[in-house]
A protein has these predicted regions:
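Histidine/acidic-residue-rich, glycine-tolerant segments that coordinate divalent metal ions
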Residues: 2-128, 214
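Metal-dependent amide/peptide-bond hydrolase catalytic core
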Residues: 88-269
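Residues that cap or delimit alpha-helices
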Residues: 1-2, 236
Length: 269
């Protein structure tokens, strides 16, 4: 196969794709290379093993991350009027954010909200000094990212003010990743090549886009590319639980189709 290649294939392996754990180092390393096109795979629990989704257009979501701390004034729980309880605005934000996104953003922006961390206090009778809230919002419209971030901050500041609190943000509160939008030409070339090598039945045309996020969008700033979703679900084996669930597992037979897709990309480029 190597004799059939015209050019050079670079293989990239990175850590922490949603958290941007390794992408800055990777992009710096790629500066000295000329890259024409890029390709990536992500295992996907909703697809049966032996299937791959390789289609044009939006495939994985962009992400806004927020890490905010509400500041009040600590005191005894018996006299909340003499304290300023930061838990109150933080708790209001749990419902407020979802309502704000639904009512103030274009419905076609399809933003979703995930509230994943709420920390405040350490005992039953003391009002704490601070309350911490973090999570993310996902979107497929590139223009939605800054709008979502602005709306989150305005909602937090207004809610904090109503309850006599202030709010601060960690530097991580920002648009962390843009949507992965497959280039039509690259996606079609890989899809056609897979049909030729493995048969058209391996291609899943009905797989919806995925709301998780990927640093592959950063690679696509450098050159056109496409990302495939590789099926790993096998009920007989017991695989197919949601990603980041304690029961998550994969059918390793899926890796064969994954390797074939990478080979097709290299040969058809």
């Amino acid at each position: 196969v190597k004799d059939e290649l015209e050019g050079t294939v670079y293989c990239c392996f990175e850590e922490g794709e949603e958290s941007n754990g390794g992408i800055a180092t990777m992009m710096k390393a790629l500066e000295k290379y000329t890259v024409d096109e890029c390709f990536a795979l992500h295992v996907y629990n909703a697809l049966e093993v032996g299937k791959i989704s390789m289609v044009a257009g939006p495939r994985m979501a962009g992400a806004v991350r927020f890490d905010m701390t509400f500041h009040g004034r600590a005191g005894h729980g018996s006299r909340p009027d003499l304290s300023i309880n930061p838990i109150v605005p933080a708790a209001h934000m749990v419902g407020e954010l979802d309502s704000a996104l639904r009512n103030q953003l274009n419905a076609e922006s399809i933003a979703t909200l995930g509230l994943c961390t709420f920390r405040a206090g350490d005992t039953w009778n003391i009002i704490p000094e601070t309350a911490f809230l973090s999570g993310s919002a996902r979107y497929f419209d590139k223009e939605a990212g800054p709008q979502v971030l602005d709306l989150i901050k305005k909602s937090a500041e207004a809610t904090a003010s109503i309850h006599r609190c202030t709010v601060t943000y960690e530097p991580t509160t920002k648009v962390i990743l843009e949507p992965v939008i497959n280039d039509p030409a690259v996606a079609a070339r890989v899809s056609d090549g897979l049909a030729e090598m493995c048969g058209a039945d391996v291609l899943d045309q009905d797989c919806g886009r995925w709301y998780a996020s990927e640093t592959f969008s950063r690679y696509m700033e450098k050159c056109p590319g496409a990302l495939g979703l590789l099926g790993i679900k096998n009920e007989k084996l017991g695989s197919g639980a949601p990603h980041h669930n304690g029961k998550f597992d994969l059918d390793e037979h899926a890796m064969v189709l994954g390797a074939c897709s990478e080979l097709v990309f290299a040969l058809k480029n």
